[in-house]
């Protein structure tokens, strides 16, 4: 993969909390997954969580492109179904499960006990703010750099992501906001993709 513009900036950014906001086919999910993989390879033994709010979406829409990235990089992962994580050859782990609890009384049950260096939430506009705040507390794995990545579709201006956590002016310390469009990812798409989408929408 080739990264350009704001996606390239995102890929090398080490800010603790990063919001890469973009529309359909802007490449944000792919870039985030490759960023996780780069972290796993650079820091053997690091633990990440990659997820969507829904477990079904995590398994059907996030796990496959993650596995594809690993395969392209020549990394053969071992799936541990008991704890829901992929283990890379160097001992790094990427947990892959949704955050939504079936029982609201156990809203944070999936997260409690996890010790992570990195968290990635795709489609983060679906994530309730209280779950986001709970996730922040999971960044505690000793000896590794910590980072929280989010890739939402553009939310409403009153959404907690835009209003409280990631203002466009980037005025919050240790928080970085990026906005990308499909044109920032045009070099990774077939020539007919953008014209087809423009015609459809």
Model-inferred region functions:
Residues 1-201:
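Phosphate/NTP-binding elements of NTP-utilizing enzymes
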């Amino acid at each position: 993969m080739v990264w350009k513009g704001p996606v390239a900036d995102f890929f090398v950014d080490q800010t603790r909390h990063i919001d890469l906001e973009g529309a359909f086919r802007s490449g944000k999910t792919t870039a985030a997954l490759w960023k996780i993989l780069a972290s796993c390879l650079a820091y053997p033994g690091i633990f990440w969580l990659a997820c969507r709010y829904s477990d079904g979406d995590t398994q059907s829409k996030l796990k496959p492109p993650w596995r594809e990235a690993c395969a392209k990089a020549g990394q053969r992962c071992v799936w541990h179904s008991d704890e829901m994580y992929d283990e890379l050859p160097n001992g790094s782990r990427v947990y892959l499960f949704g955050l939504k609890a079936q029982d609201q009384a156990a809203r944070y049950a999936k997260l409690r006990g996890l010790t992570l260096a990195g968290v990635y939430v795709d489609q983060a506009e679906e994530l309730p703010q209280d779950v986001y705040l709970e996730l922040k507390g999971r960044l505690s794995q000793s000896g590794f750099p910590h980072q929280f990545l989010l890739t939402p579709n553009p939310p409403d201006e009153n959404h907690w992501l835009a209003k409280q956590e990631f203002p466009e002016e980037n005025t919050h310390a240790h928080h970085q906001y990026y906005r990308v469009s499909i044109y920032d990812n045009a070099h990774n798409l077939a020539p007919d993709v953008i014209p087809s989408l423009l015609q459809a929408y």
